Regions:
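Contiguous, well-ordered alpha-helical segments that form the cores/surfaces of helical PPI scaffolds
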Residues: 1, 90, 295-308, 331
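Internal intein/HINT superfamily modules and their associated LAGLIDADG
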Residues: 1-82, 468
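A broad structural signal for short, well-ordered beta-strand segments within beta-sheet-rich domains
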Residues: 47-49, 302, 453
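Generic structural "secondary-structure junction" signal
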Residues: 49-52, 71-72, 79-81, 87, ...
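Conserved catalytic cores of very large enzyme subunits
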Residues: 83-291, 312, 318-495
Length: 496
């Protein structure tokens, strides 16, 4: 009946590697609540130390095999934690303005320049790749940080120092590749952030932001995503489509401007101390901390928008008529964003929104409002006739399962991918395991040299067994576990 005793019991249980929950029961006799502590076994969990802080409850400082957090909420002890979403650009050779800068050691600029440390760059990249290839304790890949490698016209494809990159790509498909081979941009012109946000630093240089390659001091204050399928469904003709699109874009612009004002106000109040420190020079020069940050507008479901607009499943983004109108829509958005930029003196860009939850939420809301009259991605292609939850395709992507030919998919997407000014990524799904690093390297090279798409990744197929970890290829059952129990491929089962 004593809450302090309950707290201590939960601490003891957690230190012993157990989870626990607390139920509160009203007494049948007396007035004190009765606390029932249930002990739950957690695998491979131990606590480094436990301490009480000035907070509503108890926070434990944990140490688990995969560096997650042990927390308690409403009496329940559970494993939690959210890995920071990080993207790092791994330069393989000292490049751009950074190569000519003196290195900083002990807080002081030295006479040696970054270009003098090629050997160390190779060592760091190799060590990074080896750690990423090991994965975690269960053989799962590390989701973050996402490494970006720049592919330029002078990229040395046969350099043996790059072999760890191709091995890492073949095993997990971890790296993203920034394609500058068929682009007028240079590596210093772009900064890759999160899973697809990619900012054009040339816009900042036009403003005279005093930026240099290693210190862009830029980002996006937020993304507003536009539901294109609803516009396509409601529009009576092309003129009406653009009228509705303009209205949604104006609302997005207004909301981002409101958010920008709030962020500036919160910054002044000291709510973002780290950002305030690093953006102090921007504030001195322009009077605003976030002057070099973009207002980002994204899109979802262009494919379904075209189908709903033409009232014809065949006129999707891959059809001649659908493709033409789809490109017209995106070019219209780019031009309108440029108009916003000129009128507001704020930076705007267009992003291929990852979607994730929004693809389902938009489709669910539209189905509730318009019923089965509006077409979602779940109603077409490989999903047709299946009872699955509604969703829309990400940004301007082709329908799921449209083709297994990666080059057909790239042919369809190349022109669309190049129209995003705020970032996009084309995931190249292999559908099988990759065993040859030479094949991986040749595939990346073929894509980079034959397409203009700015950002892409290679995604091989692999499986993870809770016991044996990483297994190349697709496996519904672990072959190593099967072998241990005596099962062989093709063996018949006897009914018991």
């Amino acid at each position: 009946t004593d809450i302090e005793v309950v707290n201590q019991l939960q601490i003891i249980a957690t230190n012993c590697g157990y989870g626990s929950t607390v139920l509160v029961r009203k007494p049948t006799i007396g007035t004190k609540d009765i606390f029932v502590v249930r002990i739950i076994k957690h695998q491979e969990t131990y606590i480094k130390n436990v301490k009480k802080v000035d907070y509503e409850g108890i926070i434990w400082c944990p140490h688990t095999k995969n560096e997650t957090i042990i927390a308690r909420r409403n009496g329940k002890v559970f494993v939690t934690g959210n890995t920071p979403f990080t993207n790092i650009t791994m330069d393989l050779i000292p490049s751009g303005q950074l190569a000519q800068q003196g290195v900083i050691i002990g807080g002081k600029i030295q006479k040696e320049k970054y270009k003098d440390f090629q050997k160390e760059m190779v060592m760091i990249n190799k060590a990074f790749c080896e750690i990423m290839m090991e994965g975690d304790a269960q053989g799962r890949l590390f989701s973050y940080p996402i490494p970006t490698y720049n592919l330029t016209k002078d990229f040395d494809w046969d350099n043996p120092d790059y072999e760890p990159i191709w091995k890492m790509t073949a095993k997990y498909g971890i790296p993203y590749f920034s394609n500058f081979i068929n682009s007028d941009m240079k590596p210093d012109d772009a900064r890759s952030m999160c899973c697809r946000l990619r900012l054009d630093n040339r816009e900042l240089r036009k403003r005279g932001g005093g930026l240099f390659g290693a210190n862009p001091l830029t980002g996006s204050i937020g993304v507003v995503t536009i539901n294109l399928p609803r516009i396509g469904y409601e529009a009576k003709n092309k003129r009406d489509y653009f009228k509705r699109l303009n209205k949604q874009m104006d609302l997005a612009k207004k909301s981002l401007q409101i958010k920008r004002k709030f962020l500036e106000k919160y910054m002044e109040k000291g709510l973002y101390p780290y950002s305030k420190f690093y953006l102090a020079d921007i504030k001195k020069r322009f009077g605003e901390y976030y002057k070099n940050h973009f207002n980002t507008i994204g899109i979802l479901g262009l494919n379904e928008s075209l189908i709903n607009f033409f009232k014809d499943e065949k006129k999707d983004i891959t059809s001649k008529e659908g493709r033409k109108f789809g490109l017209e829509i995106m070019n219209h958005m780019r031009e309108r964003l440029m108009t916003y930029q000129q009128k507001t003196n704020e930076l705007f860009n267009l992003e291929a929104t990852p979607g994730e939850g929004a693809t389902y939420k938009f489709a669910k809301a539209d189905k509730k409002r318009f019923g089965d009259d509006i077409i979602s991605a779940a109603d077409i292609g490989k999903h047709k006739g299946q009872d699955i939850a509604p969703y829309y395709t990400n940004s301007s992507q082709i329908a799921v399962g449209f083709t297994d030919d990666i080059f057909e998919a790239l042919d369809q997407q190349d022109e669309f991918q190049c129209l995003y000014t705020g970032g996009t990524v084309q995931h190249v799904y292999i559908g099988e395991q990759l065993t040859s690093t030479e094949a991986v390297k040749n595939l990346v090279r073929k894509i980079a040299e034959n397409y203009k798409l700015p950002y892409f990744s290679i995604t091989p197929t692999f499986s993870v067994c809770p016991k044996h970890g990483y297994i190349a290829g697709e496996h519904f059952y672990c072959p190593k576990c099967d072998c241990e129990v005596g099962y062989k491929e093709g063996m018949e089962f006897n009914e018991v």
